[in-house]
Amino acid sequence: MTLPAVSRSVRLSRHATHAALTAWQLAHVDEAAALLVSELVTNAVRHAEGIDVVTVNLHAGRTWLRIEVQDADRHWPQPRIPGRYDESGFGFILVDALASNWGVRETEAGKAVWAELDTRQESGPGI
């Protein structure tokens, strides 16, 4: 889905992600996926320069979900370690903690930042 590069697109991307995961019977990863899509879209909207839109793509395999956010800025994100009193800068720390894998790739128009979740459900204790 392509959205305007504005803050309200974060909420729209979360709702669309929830709808897709429900349809794909992946509701068990909805909370983590919502946080990841929120962080990735927020990063693009706040830090990508000269962009009008962001594109959010979701891809599901047998055991994984990939969330990818594309924008037209060719500059790759620079994760940093926030200071003790910083109120921002924690996005990629959260992405790293939630995702089984994440990265950045070049696209024709700019870049795509992606994060993957393991979608296998843990089985409960046996009887």
Where in the sequence are the language-model features?
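Short amphipathic
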Residues: 1-5
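Conserved short strand/loop->alpha-helix "switch" segment adjacent to the catalytic nucleotide/phosphoryl-transfer site
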Residues: 14-38
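Conserved beta-strand-loop-beta-strand hairpin that lines the nucleotide-binding pocket
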Residues: 45-127
